[in-house]
Amino acid sequence: TRIGAMKGGRTAYMRPETAQGMFMLFPALYRHFRNRLPFGAVQTGKGYRNEISPRQGMIRLREFNMAELEYFIDPDVELNHDFSKWDSVPFSLVPDPEIREPLEMSPGEASSENIIRHPTVAWFMARTWDFLVSVGIDPSKIRFRQHEGTEMAHYASDCWDAEIHGSYGWIECVGIAHRGCYDLSAHESATGDHNLRAWRPFDEPKIVDKTVLSGKGSIIGPSFRDLAGAVNEALDALNQIPTEFPFELSLDNGNQVIIEAEMVEQKRIQATEHGEWFVPHVVEPAFGIDRILWHVLDHAYDETEKAGEAYTVLRLDPSIAAIDVAILPLMEKDGLEEMANDIHRSICSTPNLASYYDGSGSIGRRYARADEVGVPWAVTVDHESMQDGTVTIRRRDDGVQVRIQVDDLVQTLSTGTISSLF
């Protein structure tokens, strides 16, 4: 592409997606998963678009972060996904408007009624919904929109976008596409290599008539000498007869040899087949990380009024808050600051917990500072703490407070059971 809007823009080669590297690595991934389907591979990284006028903050960028999953399946094997978890969860679905009206139904129903054309696409739509809700996206502001026939990518047989409603309206944040065998077949066609395939065993061996390439001994022997046996074995193992000569043949020992047309002949034989090689199909969920992050913040941001002043609360889900708890001594004297610092150090030394200490300003002002950066819990150390070893825990979203023993604080935070105290 050319960077810039004018004809004088510079030529650049930048990937629009991360997926293609995973397709080229299919043979290694297939071996890693012990030559069995289905399996998935995930890659995160940068993607690029030649946007003429980037706008809307993090929504439309020239360079953005993405995470893509390529899930390889056998098209002849029906996968039985369990949708029972979402039976009582109606999803907002917007099928192709040329065919159907918007509707509310569970992913299992949509799959069984062929509104979502492939059950694995429906499965990843459900898992995507779970993920978005778990990071703090409002469930009522999520919908799945099917691509119209004129909008569908050339490689896709079905595609649904997970759209999130925010300050800029409905924005596509995740795309879940059934890519069929397009990518692996395209790479095979371009490279002439046929190793981007998986093996499907037959239930019973089959006797078949087939055309094979057989090496001419009078030419193969003198041409390759010690490698002649390996060349004949590699010719016998070919899955597909090349359409053009000369072609490059890979041997088991890693060598590459060139086969000319006069070195081989085609023969019809009867063979016992125990299985067949096929090109797997792919279902791909692709996540726009920047757009999801922006909507997490957009849905979490809440501005109210307190004592006649604007009061901001960032209602982040505790599982994604950068800081788990604020440690606040009521005042920095009478030993309160030492006790608060001891608690702070104890929390910071615990894996997967983060706290910060704040001792300056009024306690109300310190609560406000914690609320506006999304800290879900605030621990206050007061004079009662010095007497009975308890502290106050304040919940960010409603300001409710309870007391807890200091000795139980770290465990309650680390196990995620703190909400049960309220």
Where are these regions (language model features)?
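Aromatic- and charge-enriched substrate-recognition/interaction segments
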Residues: 356-381, 385-387
